[in-house]
From Swiss-Prot:
One of its GO terms (cellular component) is ribosome. This is Large ribosomal subunit protein bL36. One of its GO terms (molecular function) is structural constituent of ribosome. NCBIfam families: rpmJ_bact (TIGR01022). Keywords: Ribonucleoprotein, Ribosomal protein. The keyword Iron-sulfur does not apply. PROSITE patterns: RIBOSOMAL_L36 (PS00828). Belongs to the bacterial ribosomal protein bL36 family. One of its GO terms (biological process) is translation. It comes from the Bacteria. It comes from Chromohalobacter salexigens (strain ATCC BAA-138 / DSM 3043 / CIP 106854 / NCIMB 13768 / 1H11). InterPro entries: Ribosomal_bL36, Ribosomal_bL36_sp. SUPFAM superfamilies: Ribosomal protein L36. HAMAP family: Ribosomal_bL36.
Length: 37
């Protein structure tokens, strides 16, 4: 899980979702998981 000021899709499987007021990226590639901090 990367915590970033700016979350971006890193590949075509990444999806940007909003969960509990936080922007997150979920993906089939575990290294692509991100949340906005």
């Amino acid at each position: 899980m990367k915590v970033r000021a700016s979350v971006k899709k890193m590949c075509r499987n990444c999806k940007i979702i909003r969960r509990n007021g936080a922007i997150r990226v979920i993906c089939t590639e575990p290294r692509h998981k991100q949340r906005q901090g």
